[in-house]
């Protein structure tokens, strides 16, 4: 019975730490870029896009296809960085628990 109570206490502590981590992830902002910085996407570590910056040279009618490609690439770059930041926070939180990877706790 004591083991069960200990596990319940650990679960409650983990839940509290998860809430705090979610707040931290919301404060972390990463930036992805493409085209040598012509397009930049800012994103939180919770994968929420916070802003997009586009160099004026790309805002020409004949640059539409290039701009689309650069936006996709910049978003992908920001997403990778946000995912890495989230994984780092998750590792710090769950590192000693021996949980299997890929549980989607973030």
Swiss-Prot record:
State the UniProt keywords alphabetically. Answer: Cytoplasm, DNA-binding
One Pfam family hit: YbaB_DNA_bd
Q: Which GO terms describe its molecular function?
A: DNA binding
Record's keyword annotation contains Glycoprotein: no
Tell me where in or outside the cell this protein is found: Cytoplasm, Nucleoid
Q: How does it assemble?
A: Homodimer.
Family according to the record:
Belongs to the YbaB/EbfC family.
* The protein's name: Nucleoid-associated protein RPD_0086
Organism the protein comes from:
Rhodopseudomonas palustris (strain BisB5)
């Amino acid at each position: 019975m004591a083991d069960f109570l200990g596990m319940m206490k650990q679960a409650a502590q983990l839940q509290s730490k998860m809430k705090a981590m979610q707040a931290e992830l919301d404060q972390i902002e990463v930036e992805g870029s493409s085209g040598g910085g012509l397009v930049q996407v800012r994103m939180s570590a919770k994968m929420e896009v916070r802003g997009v910056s586009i160099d004026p040279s790309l805002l020409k009618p004949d640059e539409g296809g290039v701009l689309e490609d650069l936006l996709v690439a910049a978003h992908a770059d920001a997403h990778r960085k946000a995912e890495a930041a989230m994984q780092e926070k998750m590792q710090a939180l769950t590192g000693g628990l021996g949980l299997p990877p890929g549980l989607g706790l973030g």
